[in-house]
Amino acid sequence: MSAIRKNLCSHITEDVASKLKSAGIKTVVDYVRMDMEHLAQETTIPYKDLVLIRRLLLAQFSTFPVNCADFYQTTIATSSILPTPVNKLNELLDGGLYSSEVTEVAGEISSGKTQFCLSCCVSVVSSAKQNIVYIDTCGGFSADRLAGIAESQLAEEHLEHILQSVKVVAAHDIFQLMSALETVKENMIKKEEPFYDLVKLVIVDSVTAVIYPSLGGQQMDGHGLMVQLSLKIKRLAADFSLAVLIINNVTGDGNVSLGKTWSHVPHNRLLISHARDQKPNVREVVLVKSSKSAVGSKIMLEITEKGTEDIK
């Protein structure tokens, strides 16, 4: 539960927060459990102010029941299925990238993961008319390549719109990544920037680059940070009906990186690899985790100047 601090709600000033901490009130739970009359005597904070703060905190942090019919209608109204650039992959995913879900693409270096992300940007903006937040942790994003994919598929007048619909954020460690996700959350709540009114896809390319360094040395701290990151990603997807696409690597023995703990994060997991006995630009994609489609199903795609696409 959140700690009591200045500006946690509008009536908690620095002086109020200090008095509450002196009285042993450290969290919101501590506060709402206290008798307000006793707390007023102990802290010299006016009783009516304490009651008002309690009401504000309960409104901010409590869970309220929702009618099932209303919840269903809200879910239907906010749900989206975003198309990937590969038709066969859309069939494999039962339509595409679902909002409120995390889809992971894992593969070895140079298997085409970033190419797939860039191609998804073009397909989502051009087909679904939605905006994208692209969080780049390893310097793999290329505006020139994105423009090249867009130019090969669309008329020149659409190029500027494609580029303006993708907001790129650099994150060089796990703390910057969590900060970037928090910024997305804040902008979705505030609704001050028109760009975020149309955001439906968040891409993280890649999680491995920022999690692995934190797992070295003090492994328990690193594991805790990984769990914290996973919760932020899943909450962002669920709370704002966003589709989240994350990129992961594979280990030397072909297993997906980050172990069993991370395996519970994605709702869908795809494994991309170089296809045997095929052209160098052909990739095999296997569905290794899904709640909607048959696990083990696979398709072939190719990487061309147009990005990732169905084999012709």
What are the residue ranges of the model-derived segments?
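Hydrophobic, well-ordered secondary-structure scaffolds
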Residues: 1, 19-21, 52, 199, ...
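Helix-hairpin-helix
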Residues: 3-57
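The Walker A/P-loop phosphate-binding site
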Residues: 19, 38-43, 49-161, 165
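Amphipathic alpha-helical transducer elements in NTP-driven molecular machines
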Residues: 83-86, 99, 115, 143, ...
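Short, ordered loop/turn segments at secondary-structure junctions
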Residues: 110, 137-139, 207, 249-250, ...
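Conserved inter-motif catalytic segment of the P-loop NTP-binding fold
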Residues: 128-219
